[in-house]
């Protein structure tokens, strides 16, 4: 069963990557911006809870963490070769000249968001806040190097 799921995941990714490779650069950039918007949409309320701007709600926090963990793996698809130009973007050209490093940083985001979802599901506020800082660090590592100010 696990092998079947893994095969389906690989085939799904290959199909999505192939479809994105056939898209115009501006379509890929639109996709990228959309994924990042959804990630930010879910990150912001979690950040507000961690910073104490709003009361911590474990159920809401876990919902946002789960959504973020679902979106993070999709981010890399939005940085397809040739999508460095074609529309207004905050992505620095260094992404494509240092793609392995960029990909590594995005993989860190995927891993930290997955862990965030698992920790948040357990409902422990202190542990969720601690993991959120690691998640924020993964975001910051990529933004500092690869996102225009």
Question: Where do the PLM segments sit?
Answer:
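Positively charged n-region of N-terminal signal peptides that target proteins for export
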Residues: 1-5
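Bacterial N-terminal signal peptides
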Residues: 6-15
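Sec/Tat signal peptide C-region and signal peptidase I cleavage site
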Residues: 16-23
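Sequence context surrounding c-type heme c attachment/ligation sites in exported
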Residues: 26-58, 64-149
């Amino acid at each position: 069963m696990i092998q079947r799921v893994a095969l389906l995941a690989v085939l799904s990714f290959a199909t999505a990557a192939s479809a994105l490779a056939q898209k115009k650069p501006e379509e890929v950039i639109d996709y990228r911006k959309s994924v990042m918007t959804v990630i930010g949409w879910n990150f912001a309320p979690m950040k507000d809870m961690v910073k104490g701007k709003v009361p911590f709600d474990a159920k809401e926090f876990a919902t946002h963490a789960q959504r973020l963990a679902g979106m993070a793996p999709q981010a890399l698809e939005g940085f397809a070769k040739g999508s460095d130009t074609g529309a207004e973007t905050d992505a620095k050209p260094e992404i494509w000249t240092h793609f392995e490093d960029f990909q590594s940083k995005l993989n860190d985001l995927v891993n930290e968001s997955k862990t965030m979802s698992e920790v948040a599901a357990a409902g422990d506020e202190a542990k969720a806040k601690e993991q959120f800082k690691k998640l924020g660090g993964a975001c910051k590592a990529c933004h500092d190097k690869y996102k225009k100010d």
